Structure formats: C-alpha cells, structure tokens
C-alpha cells in the first residue's frame, strides 16, 4: 500500500510496519499499546493526528492535485473506507464537503434552482391573472362593498403611475378588521378583474407546492387591472364627497355596515379570548351570538358585552377547574347572557372606546368617513336600527 509522506514520529517504520500500524489502529487497539509496540514518541491523545494517509489514486476535481484517503473510524467494519480528501485545497469526496470549490458549486446550483422556481411562479401568476377577465365597468356598476374595498386597498397600497401597488403589510393602517374579511375582499376584487398579483412581488410572497400556486395576500404586490384603475379610485372618492351615489349603494349601506361591525366584534372577541389563553373553535356559534348582539347594540356596546363575557369565562375556568376549550365555549354563552340581562333590565349600556391594540381599519375609514360621512358613529351607533329602517 502506498502512503503519503508520513509524520516524523513514524518515519522509522517501513511499509509493512505502517500497514501493521494502520491495522492495529483501525481494529481498536488502545493508543498506549500501539505507541509501545511501534515505539512512537508521542502522547496517546495525538496518535490519530500522525496516522499515515494513503494515496487514493484520484485527482482532485477542484485543484488537480493528488488526493489521499484517511482512516475509517476505530472499530469500523472492514468494508468501511476512510474519507478521500485533497491535502492542498481540503476538498472531500463527500456530500458534506464545504471547501471553496463545493461552496461555489452549491451556490450555482441554488441560484439555478431559484431561477427555475421564479420562472414557474411568474408563469403561475400570469395563469392566475388570466383566469379572470379584466374589469370593464364604471363606478356605477360596482356594488358598495366592492367600491369600499377597492378604495381601501388603493389607500393602503398606494399605487404608482403604472398602477403597481405596494404590499398590504407595508401600510400602517390595517386593510380590514380581520384576516378573514381581508382575504375575502381581496379574492372578490381579483375575481372581478379589478386587481391581480404583480410579477414584481417578492419571491417569498408566493410558492408552488402540492396545493398548487399559493400566495400571501399581505406580502404580494398588487396590480390594478382596469385600464382606468386610478380613475376608478377618483370616481369613488368623488361619489362619496358629493353624495352622488349609484342608487344601489343606499340600499346596500346597512348590509355593508353590518359586515364591518361583525368583523370588528369578532376581532375584539378573538383579542379578549387570546388574552386569557382561550381558543374558540365554534365560528358558527360566535357569529350567531354577535349577530344577536348587533341587533340593538353598537360595536362599542358589544365590546362591553364581550369583555364581561370573557371575564366571566376566566372566573368560570378558575372556579370549576374545567379545560380551556370548555371555558372558551362558556365565553360565547356568557356574552349572550350578559346582553340578554342588559335588555331585560333596560340597562344603559355604556360603550367602550376602541382598543389601542386593535386600530381602526381602512375599510372602516372609507365606509364611514368617505362614503356614509358618519365617522365614528359607525362604531358607537347600532347598525341594527339602520337594518330595520331599510327593511
């Protein structure tokens, strides 16, 4: 067996002795016994560092120098081979090699994979956009909810002269009270052909996986699709400023108000539950309860009912030592019972103020300030009365 130049401590050994030294070391013979047997002047702890390396009869692909093969781990079976490496550039014939050559190869491979992934994502963005025809109508053709959502998105995302918008997450004001309402409104605007995902979006904002094309509505950049997209924004603002609404908007106002009120109440309900470590899974039961409260209470008054319901659920958790899911369900009923008690005894329910941790959404600003011009009355006045008046 041919060895690379050996350490001075074992230079006195011939080829056969080196073979015997390697065999003894690999077989697991103690370092002290090996040192004594082969008369090596070295500390036992340094024995591995001076063991001879064999020429591997291979040329390094990185630098062209001859490679050597190290020893396998002590006690390894006979078919286990040592790692082949280059003594000049430290390249190893392993998947774990991180020499400069391998790092460059990995970087090139990752860059190629990234380019392929980005190309596929752009294809998916184009295909997604082409699923829905471009909006060709005017403001008069828009339902009130669509007009409010469109203007709110434009105010959050600040489209430029090319109608390219910033991501929703860049806005200091949230688009909608809840993620659910935001996603529903964004999806609705996409299906109407008013907006589409821009191929200028960050690569991290979307991906292709087993579910197909998946994107984060908060992180992608949006493109206004209508040729007069910015003109539509101005037309909606003008309709709100002058009060010259499409006839249908007046009929739809109470329903849109109710939708925003429900979202704001649900946002506060989830906030109170989260503060107490509750996770309510019964979306239907929560929606039924909030709908009942909003029949004669404002959002601000519902905040008070929800707060007392959350406090009662926390007390119930301590008193009964029940599970948190049980207490979370109790919270729903506690909110309803508090509201029923308030109605039965004709309480003057003092409204809460907005929660500092739950800032007013852009949809609320557009609906109540720009279109309806009632400001925070959308928060402090009962929507149920308007619903009954419009029925």
Model region roles, listed by residue range:
Residues 1-15, 54, 116-136, 236-247, ...:
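Basic, amphipathic alpha-helix used for nucleic-acid engagement in HTH/winged-helix/SANT-Myb modules
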Residues 15, 43-61:
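Short, solvent-exposed alpha-helical "recognition" segments
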Residues 55-61, 65, 84-87, 97:
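Cys/His-enriched microdomains
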Residues 32-49, 177-181:
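Short, basic interhelical loop/turn and adjoining N-cap
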Residues 73-101:
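Cysteine-rich micro-motifs
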Residues 29, 74, 78-81, 133-391:
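Basic, alpha-helical nucleic-acid-binding regions used in initiation and control of genome expression
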Residues 64-68, 93, 106:
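Cys/His-rich microdomains that often coordinate metals
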Residues 9-29:
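Short, amphipathic alpha-helical "recognition" segments used to contact nucleic acids or chromatin
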């Amino acid at each position: 067996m041919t060895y690379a130049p050996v350490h001075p401590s074992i230079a006195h050994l011939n080829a056969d002795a080196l073979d015997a030294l390697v065999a003894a070391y690999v077989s697991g013979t103690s370092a002290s016994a090996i040192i004594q047997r082969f008369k090596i002047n070295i500390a036992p702890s340094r024995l591995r560092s001076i063991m001879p390396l064999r020429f591997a009869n291979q040329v390094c692909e990185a630098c062209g120098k001859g490679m050597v093969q190290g020893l396998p781990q002590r006690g390894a079976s006979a078919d286990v081979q040592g790692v082949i490496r280059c003594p000049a550039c430290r390249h190893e014939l392993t998947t774990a090699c991180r020499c400069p050559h391998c790092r460059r190869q990995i970087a090139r491979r990752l860059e190629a994979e990234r380019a392929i992934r980005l190309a596929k994502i752009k294809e998916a963005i184009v295909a997604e956009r082409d699923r829905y025809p471009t909006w060709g109508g005017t403001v008069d053709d828009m339902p009130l909810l669509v007009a409010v959502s469109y203007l709110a998105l434009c105010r959050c995302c600040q489209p430029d002269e090319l109608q390219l918008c910033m991501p929703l997450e860049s806005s200091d004001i949230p688009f909608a009270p809840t993620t659910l309402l935001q996603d529903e409104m964004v999806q609705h605007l996409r299906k109407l052909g008013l907006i589409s995902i821009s191929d200028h979006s960050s690569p991290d904002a979307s991906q292709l996986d087993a579910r197909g094309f998946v994107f984060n509505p908060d992180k992608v950049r949006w493109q206004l699709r209508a040729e007069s997209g910015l003109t539509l924004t101005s037309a909606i603002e003008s309709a709100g400023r002058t009060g010259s609404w499409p006839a249908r908007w007046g009929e739809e106002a109470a329903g849109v108000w109710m939708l925003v009120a429900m979202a704001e109440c649900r946002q506060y309900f989830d906030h109170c539950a989260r503060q107490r470590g509750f996770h309510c899974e019964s979306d239907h039961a929560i929606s039924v309860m909030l709908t009942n409260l909003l029949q004669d209470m404002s959002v601000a008054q519902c905040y008070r009912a929800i707060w007392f319901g959350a406090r009662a659920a926390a007390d119930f958790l301590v008193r009964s030592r029940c599970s948190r899911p049980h207490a979370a369900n109790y919270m729903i009923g506690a909110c309803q019972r508090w509201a029923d008690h308030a109605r039965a005894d004709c309480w003057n329910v003092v409204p809460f103020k907005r929660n500092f941790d739950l800032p007013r959404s852009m949809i609320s600003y557009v609906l109540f300030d720009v279109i309806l011009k009632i400001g925070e009355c959308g928060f402090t006045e009962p929507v149920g009365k308007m619903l009954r008046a419009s029925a």
